[in-house]
């Protein structure tokens, strides 16, 4: 079963919560579209009073998406600033969330570039695939989240 998940700009849900911009890549090999956010980039989204912890140097930080391993919780943050909402597709296929983004060749600061990526994440046990939502911030951060599956109601007690 395939369930398309619409990508919505986050201002549709909460227009009063702008995020500070992420740093733009300065060199061609720094363009990590479709990869997860680095720890330092996530910290830039929070005030220092909320994140006063030690940050690893970017050379040692893992460029993987932030995916919690808590059972019944699913959340992914992806940097997709090089794509427009129309160029991004998020789908639920079985027990996986698939993200595909593609744009044709267009000019950028280094010449011309065409980009495409596919990412697939397995939903952890206890997560409802029908509850997957996604939102795109004005800065190009794609947030994909899923709520835990609702707890099954206990069987009704027999009447005495």
Swiss-Prot record:
GO molecular function, a single term: protein kinase binding
A cellular-component GO term for this protein: extracellular region
Record PTM text: The N-terminus is blocked. Phosphorylated at Ser-16 by PKA and probably PKD1K; required to protect cardiomyocytes from apoptosis.
Residue span of region Involved in stabilization of the HSPB1:HSBP6 heterodimer: 1-72
Family: Belongs to the small heat shock protein (HSP20) family.
Complex formation: Homodimer. Small heat shock proteins form high molecular mass oligomers containing variable number of monomers; these oligomers display a very flexible quaternary structure easily exchanging their subunits. Heterooligomer with HSPB1; formed through oligomerization of HSPB1:HSBP6 dimers; subunit exchange leads to formation of at least two different heterooligomeric complexes, differing in variable quantities of HSPB1 and HSPB6 homodimers in addition to HSPB1:HSPB6 heterodimers.
Summary of the function given for this chain in its UniProt record: Small heat shock protein which functions as a molecular chaperone probably maintaining denatured proteins in a folding-competent state. Seems to have versatile functions in various biological processes. Plays a role in regulating muscle function such as smooth muscle vasorelaxation and cardiac myocyte contractility. May regulate myocardial angiogenesis implicating KDR. Overexpression mediates cardioprotection and angiogenesis after induced damage. Stabilizes monomeric YWHAZ thereby supporting YWHAZ chaperone-like activity.
Name this polypeptide is given: Heat shock protein beta-6
Species for this entry: Homo sapiens
């Amino acid at each position: 079963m395939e369930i398309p998940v619409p990508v919505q700009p986050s201002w549709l849900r909460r227009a009063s919560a702008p995020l500070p911009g992420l740093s733009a890549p300065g060199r061609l090999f720094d363009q990590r579209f479709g990869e997860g956010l680095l720890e330092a980039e996530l910290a830039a989204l929070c005030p220092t009073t909320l994140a006063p912890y030690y940050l690893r140097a970017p050379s040692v930080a893992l460029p993987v998406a932030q995916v919690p391993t808590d059972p019944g919780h699913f959340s992914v943050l992806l940097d997709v600033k090089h794509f427009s909402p129309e160029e991004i597709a998020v789908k639920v296929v079985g027990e996986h969330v698939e993200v595909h983004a593609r744009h044709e060749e267009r000019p950028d600061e280094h010449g011309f570039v065409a980009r495409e990526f596919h990412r697939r994440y397995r939903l952890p046990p206890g997560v409802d695939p029908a509850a997957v939502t996604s939102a795109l911030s004005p800065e190009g951060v794609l947030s994909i989240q899923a709520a835990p599956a609702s707890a099954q109601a206990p069987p009704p007690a027999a009447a005495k």
